[in-house]
Amino acid sequence: MNWHPRARKLNFGAYPNLNPMAKVKVLVQGYTNADSKEVIGHEKTCPTITLVVDKGIVMVVDPGALDNQKILVDALAREGYLVDDVNIVCITHSHAHHYMNVGMFQKAKVLEYFGLWTGGMVQDWQENFSDDIQILKTPGHDYSGISLFVKTHEGVVAICGDVFWNEDGPEFDMYASDQKVLKHSRQLVTQMSHWIIPGHGGMYKTKQLSSIPPSGAAKSEASVAGSCKKCHRLFKKITDKCICQDWLCYHCCECEADCKVCNCKVRR
C-alpha cells in the first residue's frame, strides 16, 4: 500500500508482519494562498487531512473544511475504511477550517489540546498515546497547538498542523499568536522527525535531524554527556537543556527522576 503522498512507493513489505508499526497516509493534500502577496480579501485554504493507523487505532487528523465531504469519504474508501471505522479524530489546533468536518465521525472520540473527548466527557490524553504515537504540545501558531509524532518503518512522521504551513514556508507566520514560541515548536518538530506533514501541503523530508551516532561510528572531537530519550539531541554537559523539554536537564530526561543537578522537577 502506498503511504507516501507523493506517490513514491514505500517498502513496508520488507518488514515482518509480526511486529507491525503505525502507518501514515495523506488523504487530502492541503493548500493555501494566504501567504501570497496577490491575495486581497480572497483567501483560499484547505488543510491537509491525514490518516494514522496503529493497531486498533484508526485516526483522522484535521478533517478539514471541504466543499464536498465525499472527497474525504472516497479518500478513506481507497484505503479500505468507512467513516464509521474511524475511532479517533485529532484536531491539531483551534482554527475552524482544520476541524469543520468533525461531525462526519459520529462514532469517533475527539483528541485535542484539552483532552480526549467521548461525547460530553473528557479525559487527559497521555503523551505516549500508543507504542508508536507520541503527542506533544506545539503552540505558537495557536496556543492550543499539538503535534503527533508517529513511528513508522520509514522513520518518525510529524503531523504538526500549522507549525509549518508547507515545505516552502512562510518563515514569518502572519497568524501566529507568538512568533518566539512558534520558533521553538518548529525546532522541536524538526529535531524529532524524519518526515513532516504540514498544515497546508504534502509530506516532505526533514532537513535536519539530531540523532545518536550508530555503534562503531567515529567519535566527535567534542565530548558528549549523553542524549535525550525523546528527541535524541546530544548533550555536551549534564546541565544542558533539552529542546523538547527545556525545563529539564540531561539527568532529568534520562532518568525521569527529580534532578539533584539543577533542582528541577519532572512533570508528574
Where are these regions (language model features)?
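Zn-dependent metallo-beta-lactamase
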Residues: 1-56, 190-192, 207-221
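Short Cys/His-rich metal-coordination motifs, predominantly Zn2+-binding knuckles/fingers
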Residues: 153, 231-234, 245-247
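Active-site HxH/HxHxD metal-binding segment of metal-dependent hydrolases
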Residues: 40-41, 45-46, 63-131
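Cys/His-enriched microdomains
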Residues: 226, 240-250, 257
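Metallo-beta-lactamase
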Residues: 143-227
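Active-site neighborhood of phospho(di)ester-bond hydrolases with catalytic His/Asp-centered motifs
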Residues: 61-63, 85-95, 101, 111-114, ...
